[in-house]
Amino acid sequence: MLDKIKELTQTIEDFSIESKEQLEQFRLEYLSKKGKITSMFDGFDFKTVAPEIKKSMGQEMNKLKVLAQTKFEELQDKLNTGSNDNSVYQKIDTSLPVIPNELGGRHPINIVREQIYTVFERMGFNLSDGPEIEDDFHNFTALNFPENHPAREMQDTFFIERNPDIVLRTHTSSVQVRVMENQKPPIRTISPGRVYRNEAISARAHCMFHQIEGLYVDKNVSFADLKNTLYHFSKEMFGKDTQIRFRPSFFPFTEPSAEMDISCFICNGKGCNICKQSGWVEIGGAGMLDPNVLINAKIDPKVYSGFAFGMGIERITMLKYQIKDLRLFTENDVRFLRQFKHAE
């Protein structure tokens, strides 16, 4: 019996492991209810030991049990910390080349959006947000879109099949309607966000993109205020030498309406591929709020007037960083995105 205890003691002391499976094997073999140590206590050999040595024999067996438990904890610690030279947790070889762990950066759309917001924030504009799933009233009717307007067709707008009155917003002008409904003039706000159009995805178009639209409503607001606001924005965003021009246009929610161009900051107005040799690049649309839009928001157009403007963030980003394919913004190509890690 003593020889068996000595043999088990030596085996336990010399036991080593390289995996969790071997650790579990040790536990089952020596510490479980059916293990070797428990079997010795319950076995025939121990029961037949002479009474005068049974006490000392029991003490030796208890020492063996304590040794097994201690050894198990020691092996467990070594496995967890990787301090066992033979374990699967190998020591770190400091001579090996380091695998670079690069930190992420901001997306170019976010960079430009924050730049735009910073400029307008300095001019006293606050930030507004609204739902991307919008109802027909806020997306079309309140903005003076007639019933037969092409934007209401399925070719241009994503409608919810179960409820045709619900759409994916086609512009963030719907946010401006909600602001006017819930806030009394003076109102000065910008509303950036995702918008959706039923368009085929290509290098120049996408079904989802980002807009930022501005709204100013107060007494005696004029087109001159609109021009000065966008003039200041253009110089802050694209450089102090930037010039702007307005071309007559049409939008249902503004009258008069205009398209805004800026002098090409790539060629300084001399003509290049970016501006198609014209010296000008289109940035967005703007105009004075149509009185019907104010009436729909329960604002008296005889007392208040206002202007609105909108521009595509992707377009500004593409111009600013000379990006030629719109799809790059949504493809998550790390080679493309890492170029903007330190962009300003």
Swiss-Prot record:
Cofactor binding, per record: Binds 2 magnesium ions per tetramer.
Protein name from the UniProt record: Phenylalanine--tRNA ligase alpha subunit
Organism: Cytophaga hutchinsonii (strain ATCC 33406 / DSM 1761 / CIP 103989 / NBRC 15051 / NCIMB 9469 / D465)
Known partners and oligomeric status: Tetramer of two alpha and two beta subunits.
Alphabetized Gene3D superfamilies for the sequence: Bira Bifunctional Protein, Domain 2
GO cellular component: cytoplasm
Pfam hit, one: Phe_tRNA-synt_N
GO biological process: phenylalanyl-tRNA aminoacylation
Family named by the database record: Belongs to the class-II aminoacyl-tRNA synthetase family. Phe-tRNA synthetase alpha subunit type 1 subfamily.
EC number: 6.1.1.20
Subcellular compartments: Cytoplasm
Domain of life: Bacteria
SUPFAM superfamilies (alphabetical): Class II aaRS and biotin synthetases (SSF55681), tRNA-binding arm (SSF46589)
Keywords assigned by UniProt, alphabetized: Aminoacyl-tRNA synthetase, ATP-binding, Cytoplasm, Ligase, Magnesium, Metal-binding, Nucleotide-binding, Protein biosynthesis
